[in-house]
Amino acid sequence: MSQAKSNKMGVVQLTILTMVNMMGSGIIMLPTKLAEVGTISIISWLVTAVGSMALAWAFAKCGMFSRKSGGMGGYAEYAFGKSGNFMANYTYGVSLLIANVAIAISAVGYGTELLGASLSPVQIGLATIGVLWICTVANFGGARITGQISSITVWGVIIPVVGLCIIGWFWFSPTLYVDSWNPHHAPFFSAVGSSIAMTLWAFLGLESACANTDVVENPERNVPIAVLGGTLGAAVIYIVSTNVIAGIVPNMELANSTAPFGLAFAQMFTPEVGKVIMALMVMSCCGSLLGWQFTIAQVFKSSSDEGYFPKIFSRVTKVDAPVQGMLTIVIIQSGLALMTISPSLNSQFNVLVNLAVVTNIIPYILSMAALVIIQKVANVPPSKAKVANFVAFVGAMYSFYALYSSGEEAMLYGSIVTFLGWTLYGLVSPRFELKNKHG
């Protein structure tokens, strides 16, 4: 028993894992993407920060009162039965599968900029597969090893970003910031809306503590703390750092950069310092991917334990690592990386990001809707339940706004992926629906 507990994550490791899942993949390219819109994107930040905190608070409540295992799938089951559990885990798993390939591609792109290398599309695809496999194999040591490695690599993002938040003000130009407000003169709501998907991509990961509930010490207490702490910490760092950098680097240079933080430090100090920052960013990106690869294996394992996914995802080693499932996942991702080989890596990256955001929002909406009944079952006093239900409603409304802002193409493909899930559930439904009827 004590040995099993020793391989579980504590609250600090889980909070760091939640933060690194958001920060590592999200913030690296964010200043470049937001510069395409202008500094008016600070309004998008505030909207997304409020929406994300509402989601995080509601997830914390779900974590406190839910008595079902499996993270978001367990929450959804309260309101939508076994089909809701399946759909939450299926769409979340698909989202992570897509997002992890996008993260790996961005790590390769950042690394080539650091080394001054020029890779062909095929070489980029092969390098992406290499990154995916390295980050998968590093997870074979179990939950505690993953937490320890992530807690080291997160500093690759925290040091330069927090450093920029503190010392960047000495190079900050208010005039430059104001001139970059809305460079393309887009209508207000159009400009704010076009930044929403970008900012939410940065926050994806606020639910990762929920996905890892089965490998956490004292989940009732630790999951809510980790979700809220990780989200709040990331929100402050995001908003300050991306707005400081917009007052240091001219808008056009920032929009055309492939390594915005490296560019900022190169302008503040020397090109060599910029290279060091880029190296730290590559390290943090790989650490983020490491955390996500562990999370997706855990999501697939939870679904397999429930009987939704094939049994191969449930098999674990002596250190509780679902190695066979991890290998299956990375093989699928390798195929996806080969399929995405394209002369325009950036456009392919954006398609992957938007599709990942859309599919990730589905389990968010299911979880928000389920909080009402979760609290009723837990006999939460009506006055307290009303507050949490209202916050969950705000989180759901933000989720729908984010879906709308993701664009028609992402919504189309995301819908097809989601509807396919209902068909797949039909194939496994007899083992659940017949049991319910005869039970």
From Swiss-Prot:
It is a multi-pass membrane protein. The gene is potE. Residues 1-9, 61-90, 135-151, 207-224, 297-320, 375-386, 431-439 are cytoplasmic. Monomer. Changing W292 to F/L/Y: Strong decrease in both uptake and excretion activities. Changing Y308L: Excretion activity decreases more than uptake activity. Changing C286A: Moderate decrease in both uptake and excretion activities. Pfam families: AA_permease_2. Belongs to the amino acid-polyamine-organocation (APC) superfamily. Basic amino acid/polyamine antiporter (APA) (TC 2.A.3.2) family. GO terms for cellular component: plasma membrane. Uptake activity, but not antiporter activity, is inhibited by CCCP and N-ethylmaleimide (NEM). Uptake of putrescine is inhibited by high concentrations of ornithine. Induction: Induced at low environmental pH. Part of the speFL-speF-potE operon. Keywords: Amino-acid transport, Antiport, Cell inner membrane, Cell membrane, Membrane, Symport, Transmembrane, Transmembrane helix, Transport. Changing C285A: Moderate decrease in both uptake and excretion activities. Changing W201 to F/L/Y: Strong decrease in both uptake and excretion activities. InterPro entries: AA/rel_permease1 (IPR002293), Amino_acid_antiprt (IPR004754), APC_superfamily (IPR050367), Symport/antiport_PotE (IPR027566). It catalyses: putrescine(in) + H(+)(in) = putrescine(out) + H(+)(out); putrescine(in) + L-ornithine(out) = putrescine(out) + L-ornithine(in). This is Putrescine transporter PotE. GO terms for biological process: putrescine transport. Changing K68A: Slight decrease in both uptake and excretion activities.
